[in-house]
Swiss-Prot record:
ADP binds at residues 13, 17, 266, 309, 410, 414. This is Glycerol kinase. It is an enzyme of class 2 (transferase). PANTHER family: GLYCEROL KINASE, SUGAR KINASE. GO terms for biological process: glycerol catabolic process; glycerol metabolic process; glycerol-3-phosphate metabolic process. Its EC number is 2.7.1.30. One of its GO terms (molecular function) is ATP binding. ATP binds at residues 13-15, 266, 309, 313, 410. It comes from Shewanella woodyi (strain ATCC 51908 / MS32). The keyword Kinase applies. It catalyses: glycerol + ATP = sn-glycerol 3-phosphate + ADP + H(+).
Length: 495
């Protein structure tokens, strides 16, 4: 049969999805399943790797069955994933030795402090482009090796494998035949030299991590292996891998230096492509690996906010202020302002540009007149304020004053948030017609690897803009609002 489709597996922090795209990059079918969030104690976040696999494999089977497409019509599968989340498993049985430690988890803070005391902070920053923070995989691996009975001994005997979620899924899809990752995911481990594009022996020694645990690093657009899980029709090539944020950057076709996007998901992630130059940040951002127009390694500046959409989940699940995330736009629009209320959602510390794991959330400026609408509006505004923090830092590091910001992720459907983002940054915010840019990036990579598409120039017609949001408030208003935010943040950092 003719190859007519590409499948993207989008393994996120709260759900696993499978999306089928046709040759025009239109969405044909979608399947999604949520999975359990595990919070063993304050600041700890885990997932069950087997539940992730069950949810992801079932969506793949379901999306093909639901669409009526024959597996033989699928050219390839691309994978995009929550980054940094850490899985270690037995290479013979395939059984994880512990739950996956999620990117949000802060349990390895003491390990980070220990590395700082050894004087390794500058070396790690220069080599990996990352900060010494519990966010990244390296210290999570060490925590498992040091704290789960018998695991270090098994690792040193070569019995175990490590992977971020992309690696885990490829290993499962290929029935244990393939242990790989790509440069975008490798660059988030704290173990990868982004300049030589290889695992760094000095950091591995400092963390006492056996190199035998680590996957082979292959290009983001390449055939890694085949899977038989998708039903009748033979094997399907697995041909694209990218961490979720780099995948979104590629899906938005930000393949040239100076192009940037912000993804509004569980967290918020602002990335700017810097081309072949790895720009070192002096303002709390990360230097990471991105993907160029031909699938080659590019570099990017990245700012990460831990609590984006997760802040809205908190309003719903813990406070009961809303029934659905979509309700926030209605409630926020019922008041002219927050009336001085600011929410700083530092529930698991603060990410870029502050990097303070000890910061805790705060709701400030409350008066007797403060109500549900003010708090909900403050939660939405907090997402935009945190993104403004990143944008300011990026401009200082890169020397580029952004005029346009491409956006994607679930929260971009919220017109109130998008307009406030434009207002508080004085930047035009562009929402694409197809907002599934993270999955689309994985599909593009997988399709390009097998010749389903010839080049990214063939894909540029998919970059249509649904709506542009232009700044609409005065500089004075903007500065006053942002000063209030900065004051609120300072209270969470300084106690």
């Amino acid at each position: 049969m003719t190859k007519k489709y590409v499948v993207a597996l989008d393994q996120g922090t709260t759900s696993s999805r499978a999306i089928i795209f046709d040759h025009d990059a239109n969405i044909v079918s979608v399947s999604q399943r949520e999975f359990t969030q595990i919070y063993p104690q304050a600041g700890w976040v885990e997932h069950d790797p087997m539940e992730i696999w069950a949810s992801q494999s079932s969506t793949l089977i379901e999306v093909i069955a639901r669409s009526g497409i024959h597996a033989s019509e699928i050219a390839s599968i691309g994978i995009t994933n929550q980054r940094e989340t850490t899985v270690i498993w037995d290479k013979q049985t395939g059984k994880p030795v512990y739950n996956a430690i999620v990117w949000q988890c802060r349990r390895s803070s003491e390990i980070c402090e220990e590395l700082k005391s050894q004087g390794l902070e500058a070396y790690i920053r220069d080599t990996t482009g990352l900060l010494l923070d519990p966010y990244f995989s390296g210290t999570k691996i060490k925590w498992i090796l040091d704290n789960v009975s018998g695991v270090r001994e098994r690792a040193e005997r070569g019995e175990l494998l490590f992977g971020t979620i992309d690696t885990w899924l490829v290993w499962k899809l290929t029935e244990g035949k393939v242990h790989v990752t790509d440069p975008t995911n490798a660059s988030r481990t704290l173990l990868f030299n982004i300049h030589t594009q290889s695992w760094d022996k000095r950091i591995l020694e400092a963390l006492t991590i056996p190199e035998s645990l680590l996957p082979q690093v292959k290009p983001s657009s390449a055939v890694y292996g085949k899977t038989r899980i998708a039903g009748e029709g033979g094997e399907i090539s697995i041909a694209g891998i990218a961490g979720d944020q780099q995948s979104a950057l590629f899906g938005q076709l930000c393949t040239e230096p100076g192009m940037a996007k912000n993804t509004y998901g569980t967290g918020c992630f602002l990335l700017m492509n810097t081309g072949e130059k790895a720009v070192k940040s002096n303002h709390g951002l990360l230097t990471t690996i991105a993907i160029g127009a031909k699938g080659e390694v590019n570099y990017a500046l990245e700012g990460s906010v831990f609590m984006g959409g997760a802040t809205i989940q908190w309003l719903r699940d813990e406070l009961g202020l809303i029934r659905d995330a979509q309700d926030t736009e209605y409630f926020a629009s019922r008041v002219e302002s927050t009336n001085g209320v600011y929410l700083v959602p530092a529930f698991v510390g603060l990410g870029a540009p502050y990097w303070d794991p000890s910061a805790r959330g705060a709701l400030v400026g409350l008066t007797r007149g403060s109500n549900r609408n003010h708090i909900i509006r403050a939660a939405l505004e907090a997402i935009a304020y945190q993104s403004r923090d990143l944008l300011d830092a990026m401009a200082k590091d890169s020397g580029v004053e952004l005029k346009k910001l491409k956006v994607d992720g679930g929260a971009v459907a919220n017109d109130f948030l998008m307009q406030f983002q434009a207002d508080i940054t004085s930047v035009e915010v562009q929402r694409p017609a197809v907002t599934e840019t993270t999955a689309m990036g994985a599909a593009f990579l997988a399709g390009l690897a097998v010749g389903f598409w010839d080049s990214t120039s063939e894909l540029k017609h998919r970059a249509d803009i649904d709506k542009s949001f232009m700044p609409s408030i005065s500089e004075e208003q903007k500065d006053e609002l942002y000063a209030g935010w900065q004051k609120a943040v300072s209270q969470t950092i300084n106690g």
